[in-house]
Amino acid sequence: MATLLEQLSTMTVVVADTGDLDAIRKFTPRDATTNPSLILAAAQIPAYQSLIDEALHSSRQLLGNSAAVEEVVHEALDEICVIFGKEILKIVPGRVSTEVDARLSFNTEATIAKAHKLIGLYNDAGITNDRVLIKIASTWEGIKAAEVLEKDGIHCNLTLLFGFSQAVACAEAGVTLISPFVGRILDWYKASTGRDSYAGPEDPGVISVTKIFNYFKTYDYKTEIMGASFRNLDEIIELAGCDLLTISPKLLDQLGSTEAPLKRKLDAVNPVAAESQIHVDKESFESMMRADRMAFEKLDEGIRGFSKAIETLEAQLAHRLAVLEGGAAFCHVVQEIFMLNDLDGDGCITREEWLGSDAVFDALDHDHDGRLLQEDVRSGLGAALALTTA
């Protein structure tokens, strides 16, 4: 019998949800998606250090030796996203999704400018627009930015989508693709209700995507639907037939090792009759979002989470730049890392505030008092810097 992955691939485009190039090679998906958290995770893999260094060198060369560390790091962040994207496109035959800085989620003009910059970097590398999706958070401002970008020939993937109003607004804006977050919807309902689990068809995330799918197909919207953020195989099985599903390497591995019959659950040709068609403007969008506490809270949480991942990556890039440049930017790096981790601004970092691993915290905590002062970070990273530049 064929595996679940083999059967799923005949009815749904399977997309790898990872920045790990080896995982993408293993599963040979058509497309791949990345986000700040995935890029941050991939940046920890030693094999990819050369890609990080390439971006830092390129950004320093572009901006010049007099440019401040934060300028170089900010430029390198765009370079890194595109460098990983270019490597992914050497493996997958289809598209890669590259995300706009989540901190721009409520700024339409800044989002448009960043998208043009990212697609320009791809174009400079000889990659055409049809192979790239620019990921933008599904705020009203983000959706309006995507509407402009689509008219400019830049295709968009609207992410952090949790509510029906977001989906309808995206479809009416003519965006290429949306990514409703199945698992994060489930997370909210489990936390809100205290219920430990939901059977596949009862899963709130599955219900949400199914509703969006049938609505889009009933009213002939061209926007593709890519279910994302899965927590278990049942969610994937219940959405077999969706346009696309972006799946983590762990779940791809389970699908590829499980032999069982798989039934199509969603049918674009014969959708289940949807509710009456609606139209969404800014006022109705905001009203519907306020009324949907889950969507409102998860969108806010998602933007904050992706923003924090970017800030963490920037701090790591600043540290790496200091290593590459022989410590010239070291004091700035220490300050940036300290400010990022000192969440309550009281001048010390506790283990609970520390964003890194326990092993690193323990190494920096010389007096073992469970608190890091700026001098602890400076002396600890200084020793590491001396070793890496020796």
UniProtKB/Swiss-Prot annotation:
Ca(2+) 2 binds at D365, D367, D369, R371, D376. It is found in: Cytoplasm. Pathway: Carbohydrate degradation; pentose phosphate pathway; D-glyceraldehyde 3-phosphate and beta-D-fructose 6-phosphate from D-ribose 5-phosphate and D-xylulose 5-phosphate (non-oxidative stage): step 2/3. It catalyses: D-sedoheptulose 7-phosphate + D-glyceraldehyde 3-phosphate = D-erythrose 4-phosphate + beta-D-fructose 6-phosphate. GO terms for molecular function: calcium ion binding; transaldolase activity. PROSITE patterns: EF_HAND_1, EF_HAND_2, TRANSALDOLASE_1, TRANSALDOLASE_2. NCBIfam families: PRK12309.1, talAB. The active site is at K135. The lineage of its organism: Bacteria, Bacillati, Cyanobacteriota, Cyanophyceae, Synechococcales. It holds the Pfam family TAL_FSA. Ca(2+) 1 binds at D342, D344, D346, C348, E353. Keywords: Calcium, Cytoplasm, Metal-binding, Pentose shunt, Repeat, Schiff base, Transferase. One of its GO terms (cellular component) is cytoplasm. Coiled coil: none annotated. It comes from Prochlorococcus marinus (strain MIT 9313). CDD domains: Transaldolase_TalAB. The gene is tal. This is Transaldolase. Its main location: cytoplasm. GO terms for biological process: carbohydrate metabolic process; pentose-phosphate shunt. It is an enzyme of class 2 (transferase). Belongs to the transaldolase family. Type 1 subfamily. InterPro entries: Aldolase_TIM, EF-hand-dom_pair, EF_Hand_1_Ca_BS, EF_hand_dom, TAL/FSA, Transaldolase_1, Transaldolase_AS. Transaldolase is important for the balance of metabolites in the pentose-phosphate pathway. Its EC number is 2.2.1.2. Residues 329-364, 365-388 form the EF-hand domain.
